[in-house]
């Protein structure tokens, strides 16, 4: 198998670097490539004020590639993305072909709902008098246990 032989011989490579000063300014980067041609990398620079600028890239063995350049500062996070991934063209974002061994989802069947039946109100023979609400009052003592805790004290007090 030539593919297997290639992956055994070419295992890939990686590089990385980083630096930071006493003021909080920093920089780092790395790059990784495998023996089949896939790569990914990242680089970022930051300062003591919390501003960041960087990018990352990824390239797959089938040719798909993405690069993201970003800035994060007092104005927020902003990213610029460049890619050739399927379904991401501005002219036809939903045009990506989906290849799957599974059947597409089936829309649920909504049950038919009949209109509600409203019964006619009974006819009133005459006006009914209702008694005025009674006025009453009540009072009660309700006790709740509450734990009291202080250094050297641990008991329950009931009010």
Curated annotation (Swiss-Prot):
Pfam families: Chitin_bind_4 (PF00379). One of its GO terms (cellular component) is chitin-based extracellular matrix. InterPro entries: CHIT_BIND_RR_consensus, Cuticle_Struct_Prot, Insect_cuticle. One of its GO terms (molecular function) is structural constituent of chitin-based larval cuticle. Residues 23-89 form the Chitin-binding type R&R domain. Keywords: Cuticle. Component of the rigid cuticle of the spider. This is Adult-specific rigid cuticular protein 15.7. It comes from Araneus diadematus. The lineage of its organism: Eukaryota, Metazoa, Ecdysozoa, Arthropoda, Chelicerata.
């Amino acid at each position: 198998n030539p593919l297997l032989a290639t992956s055994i011989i070419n295992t890939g490579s990686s590089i990385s670097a980083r630096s930071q000063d006493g003021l909080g300014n920093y920089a780092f980067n790395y790059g990784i490539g495998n023996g089949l041609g896939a790569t990914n990398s990242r680089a970022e620079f930051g300062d003591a004020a919390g501003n960041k600028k960087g990018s990352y890239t990824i390239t797959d063995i089938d040719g798909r590639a993405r690069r993201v350049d970003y800035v994060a500062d007092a104005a927020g996070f902003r990213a610029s993305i460049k890619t050739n991934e399927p379904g991401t063209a501005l002219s036809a974002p939903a045009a990506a072909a989906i290849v799957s061994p599974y059947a597409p989802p089936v829309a649920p069947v909504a049950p038919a709902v009949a209109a509600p039946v409203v019964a006619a109100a009974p006819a009133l023979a005459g006006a009914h008098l209702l008694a005025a609400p009674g006025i009453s009052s009540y009072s009660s003592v309700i006790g709740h246990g509450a734990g009291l805790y202080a250094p050297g004290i641990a008991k329950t007090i009931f009010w």
